[in-house]
Amino acid sequence: MTLLVITEQTIHSLCLDHGETNQIIAEIKQLEKPELLFSYITDAEPLATGEVFVGPDICGNCITHTFRVPDYVAKPPPYDSKRVYYPYSYTCLGFDSHPYDYLLTLDTKSIFQAIRKITLTRKLSIATQSDLDLIILKKLTTQSNCQSRVSSIWRQCVAACLAFEPQIQNNNSTQSPNLNNLVKRMFATLLKPIGRLPFYERRRNFVWEEEVSCPTILPLLLYSIQNLVTQFCAGVINRMEMILAFQYYLDCGVTAYQDEKLRLQKLIRNWLREGLAKFSKIAMPNWTVSGVISCTTVKPIMITTHEAREIKSAREAREASVPTYLLQYINHAIHKAISPYQTHQYWQATRVFANDGTYFASVAALTLNKAVRPRIEETTVKYPNSRYLTMNKEHIAVSLPNETDTNFGLACQFVKQFIPRLVTRLKNTNFQEEFIAFLTSSSSGKDFEDAAIATMTRTIQRVAKKRIVAAGLESRSYLNQQFIADECLAAAKLVGRTQIGRRQRAIAGVNNTRSLLGFPPMLMLKALLDMTGTTSSGKQMGNYLDLLIPLGLSPYANVIFNSADVDAMDASVQASVQQIMWHFVVYIALQLERTDYFAFTSGDEVIYELVEGKDSVATSIHMSGLARSCLRAMHLLQPQNCVLNDDIVGELVTREPTFPSGQPFTTVHHTFTLSNAIMGGTLRVTNLTNQPSTLLNLTVQGDDTRTINYGPKGCIEKCIDDQSSFVSDWGFKVSNETSSHTSEYLQQRVSCGTFVGYPDRVSLFAAERPKEGKTMKEKMSEIWSLVTDLGCRSRDPQRLVRLMYAIGVACCCRLTIRTERLVAEEFIASEVGRACCAEILVPKVAARADRGVMLRYHYPISALWLEEGGQLPPLATKRRDGTWTCFPSYYFQRGDSNRYWYWDVSLTEEKWITTVEMRSDWDSNNAIELIDDEILEAYATRYALAALGLNKTRQMERLRLSEESTIFDVEQLASGLNAYRNLSKIAISHRASERLKNAGVELPDSVLYSRHTQSRIQDAILKAQMTEKEEIEMSLYFFKDKGYLRSLRELVKSKSGDLAMIHRCEWGERVTILESSIFNVVSTTPLSMEVYPGSIMSFILCYTGLKGAHSGQLAGLVGLLQGKYGGGKISELQFSIAKKIYLTKPYLLNEFIIACGLGGEAELALKNALHAFEMLRGVEFSTVHTPRQFFFGVDSGVTLGNHLDYPNGFPGTRIELAAHLLLAMNFLSSNAQSCTGRSIRVRVPRGMWSRCTNF
């Protein structure tokens, strides 16, 4: 039986004809049967031992590999009850010494047989080592293995098969035919020996067929194949790299898959500098400080002594451990690469070998010691002292030291120049209100006793652990110092965090009270570090401007980069190092007079000055409440033990105090410490030697640092040694990467003047937390975000469109909800229900009648590109006259561009000429007349819109926030927190909102300053997981509303911005990109893996120019047309409400501004935005702008002026010109794959924009 024929053709061609929509639904529905799904993904011959593969690598050079299938694939080793797998000490040491942290490769059947044999007579007990091994193995196999992001692992396998082209498209004689259908061959290799799907997913767990024999690591290997498809579609690897990677993954799985990958991953990818060292000189883009390329520069490569030593050490370590076939590939890459760009291609491929895209998940107790065990790496750091003591004999930094022979003194030498500005900035800060705003709806880690929340409704009880709710419950206790002390002295709870490419971490789940004391240093140090210029998140803009410093300095001779990473920084922070931060923070807090902070009030305090050789001298100082809280925190938050409540072995306490990694100040503490270590040490050496330092730039974020040194080679090498020793003096061990041409910072690399991203860090199919019930829009929005993150790191992002559609069709085009049987049957019998193949699922286990039934229906494929649905770039669809809409583009800008498809597919050229251009009265009200109902029906648009009508957020509000008792509880919780906010401002806001209410304008809580806290508590309530009862009640809102019975015109309604839909763009005759200032550079030199000569983005950049060069008077108007009002000072909801007030009751606008608590810049921004809105009469063409999608280029259209043709005459007004630019950008981004450098013709009815706007 041939499966998914039309679906495969559609995804591979990305074209959809009228009659294929219903066929795709029918084909996808076939995969509801597990045996058919198994048949589809294994429809190929398995890979065989001894099979020889020959083909081109990612750079086109021929390579060969003889495949070998390890024995465990068909015959996994059985569980042996006599063997100890995860030795447990049965003491406070826990799993102190054990060879493996992650899942071992064993036969699942033998594990479940052993468990069943024991549980026939008794329960498994952790008191017996063999029982404990079984409990751990079961959890790792069923729970830690489950990482599916979008749908079940099996449907994700279908998506991988759909996205991968089964046949080689070109007639390449060097490529062996056995590379055809490669993905299905990989799946067949793993699954055909089993003969069926060996497990299914339920509630974030795998439920295994206990009589089926298969390897425990099978799910991880399936995810790894899915990831290989992702990387293949992105152009990062070719088929031969897929074979090598799959071979490596299978080899890693012989004993312990994840442990082996961790052991080798750094060694496999440690060869980049060695690969680049073969080039004596490299042509690099010459970036200016504003982010513009002026020309290219040829830079001689300088290999320092440090770099040569590091390269030699890396090669020796690699050759001692890495499998031979991977070593051969790396040596092949070093030898065959003819340019730095090809070296980068090969290096990215080896990163994929090292990282399969899965998360390193395990039982937290197993990885605890490696995650948090304290260690002293280099030096024991002395505690900072002060000559002043409090009455409790605590050192207090009334003044800063001047000496340079202590770490504290060195730190102060660097930062004291910023202190006056810092104090001025902080003086008007309301620390209490800032802390309340800091609280989120994440878990606080605190379990409330039943008595403490017994008076609250069930709705509140379910979310009591959320930070904002927990703070409301204990808000009055924040005025009690004893309560704060008791809460802080309790051991912090550790929680495991899994990551891609890094071992499992343990994060301290810091409760609200600890956060309360840890918040002031975070706020103070964040403000300080902003001033020093050494701190950088590295990702503020999300585009190349974040990398401008290393990009700009790369072409210069005598510049050396040193990327340094502190090994295990959380575990290496000594208590004395923390005290240095606290001493500084206390000193700053002492300057902020009369700043109270919860239980800590300002007042006079007696302190004692230690005078050498004399008795201490008592004196009185004024101490702010903030300083008192910081003094208390110095001792309450450190030293601190943590406890892990493991659901297998119970409670484990860390043996020694460790750094509280979950504290608000964790990142700024590390940044502050490393900045001071390097800058303080540099200042000391400069002053002692009277010689200038070669340190040109320092950036630090957490445990990541990058120094850029400029000067003679010998001086630089000495300074780099000094910088490492400065960090060592603070007790840290540093790993350096020194180079004149490549550097890494925060997982972003600049190499040879280009951006080289890490595509292996993006996983589309695996997630830290398995999938939850999400709408299609939520799922596809997440996929879009990941794809654009991957695209800018990859060679061929256009191919990712096919992958997005494969994921959408296989994983997101169905919805399963719980509802009442009669309602479900009524929907199934409806026209929409029949079209969407709706059915009631038969449960595997009989359910109670009051639990309702599970209804499943399928979305038409058109739902994937509608604005209410997935918002993917629309497939190429056929119009009435046989012409097609544009081919879907990776650079497509979501939003109103999706709505434009209604007009694009409806308007033939003949209709445009005879109907559109012949009339001059078009506006946003009558634009809807131009859509073709019949053609939209042919693409099942009505069915798609009807099926997408289930709005979970709105219906959840009705369910949870309608009970009076819940509303009362929310008010009570908020009142406790509001007591710490600006009470006068709250009162003013409340009175203004009451006046608006009396005038007939009722505002939602989320825009009101006075009800900001209530709104955030409500958000926490809405985010709680749904109960079965809520699922049923929520579905009833949708089905009883009968929205699925509406007509197409009821579902596609007019919008105020529909005027912008009446346009047509096409390629012109003029070749315009030759005049671009960047053309000569991008046609010869790569800027990144995505931008290289001849790439799609290299053409687009010649149209848009670089972001650094973005300027022009029309930028503001184009922004207004895109719906960008207020410059980020006001929220979208605030502006939406303000528009209605402005148009209907403008005299109430000032009351609205007061009620929202807007002032200064925000008030001015709102009034300017409303004025612009009035001028535009609400016309806009709003699109989503993702920085990484246009990593280098301007994505607004404002720079396209020289590339436009105006067949209906040059625009007569500025707004009409801005509209032409915006519509041209929409065309360019939607048609990027057909871009050849020609001009863009924008066709708009003459004078339409001038008539419909006030500009």
Curated annotation (Swiss-Prot):
<dbReference type="InterPro" id="IPR054002">
    <property type="entry name" value="RdRP_C"/>
</dbReference>
<dbReference type="GO" id="GO:0016787">
    <property type="term" value="F:hydrolase activity"/>
</dbReference>
<dbReference type="GO" id="GO:0044423">
    <property type="term" value="C:virion component"/>
</dbReference>
<keyword id="KW-0808">Transferase</keyword>
<keyword id="KW-0378">Hydrolase</keyword>
<comment type="function">
    <text>RNA-directed RNA polymerase that is involved in transcription and genome replication. Following infection, it catalyzes the synthesis of fully conservative plus strands. After core assembly, which consists in recruitment of one capped plus-strand for each genomic segments and polymerase complexes, the polymerase switches mode and catalyzes the synthesis of complementary minus-strands.</text>
</comment>
<keyword id="KW-0693">Viral RNA replication</keyword>
<dbReference type="InterPro" id="IPR007097">
    <property type="entry name" value="RNA-dir_pol_reovirus"/>
</dbReference>
<protein>
    <recommendedName>
        <fullName>RNA-directed RNA polymerase</fullName>
        <ecNumber>2.7.7.48</ecNumber>
    </recommendedName>
</protein>
<dbReference type="GO" id="GO:0019079">
    <property type="term" value="P:viral genome replication"/>
</dbReference>
<dbReference type="Pfam" id="PF22213">
    <property type="entry name" value="CPV_RdRP_C"/>
</dbReference>
<keyword id="KW-0548">Nucleotidyltransferase</keyword>
<dbReference type="GO" id="GO:0003723">
    <property type="term" value="F:RNA binding"/>
</dbReference>
<dbReference type="InterPro" id="IPR043502">
    <property type="entry name" value="DNA/RNA_pol_sf"/>
</dbReference>
<keyword id="KW-0946">Virion</keyword>
<feature type="domain" description="RdRp catalytic">
    <location>
        <begin position="548"/>
        <end position="756"/>
    </location>
</feature>
<dbReference type="GO" id="GO:0003968">
    <property type="term" value="F:RNA-directed RNA polymerase activity"/>
</dbReference>
<dbReference type="Pfam" id="PF22212">
    <property type="entry name" value="CPV_RdRP_pol_dom"/>
</dbReference>
<dbReference type="Pfam" id="PF22209">
    <property type="entry name" value="CPV_RdRP_N"/>
</dbReference>
<dbReference type="InterPro" id="IPR054006">
    <property type="entry name" value="RdRP_N"/>
</dbReference>
<keyword id="KW-0696">RNA-directed RNA polymerase</keyword>
